[in-house]
Amino acid sequence: MTFDEAGDLLDRMAEKFPEEFYADLNGGISLLPDEMPDPEFPPGEMYILGEYCDDQMGKYILLYYGSFAALAAKEEWTEADWEEELYATLAHEFTHHIEGLAGERGLDLKDEAFLESWHEELDP
């Protein structure tokens, strides 16, 4: 899937989320061409697919096309796989946003536990 095709798909997906999810998301959702390997893992093992950001620029969601493309090539994704991964990542980042508005950290803690288990698996 090309960058433009992924962007079009992401636009269609974003329109399906409830309006309430966009409360205070003043920076919106951006698809960037970057590949973001996670520096805490061996090369090619883990990629950052998306991020929820809350900083001086505002609140916004970034998705990294290059990371999706790297995994798609490695795992031989179909178009359905692209759709599933983009949707799951967007929903995940929206959850971070909504939890952040509520002062909750449940998904942050779950993410930390997931990454810790990967580290343990790689370095038994």
Which residues are covered by each model-predicted region?
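PRPP/pyrophosphate-binding module of the type I phosphoribosyltransferase fold
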Residues: 90
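Walker B catalytic acidic pair
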Residues: 93
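Active-site scaffold of zinc-dependent metalloenzymes
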Residues: 42-87, 97-123
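Zn2+-dependent metallopeptidase catalytic core
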Residues: 9-26
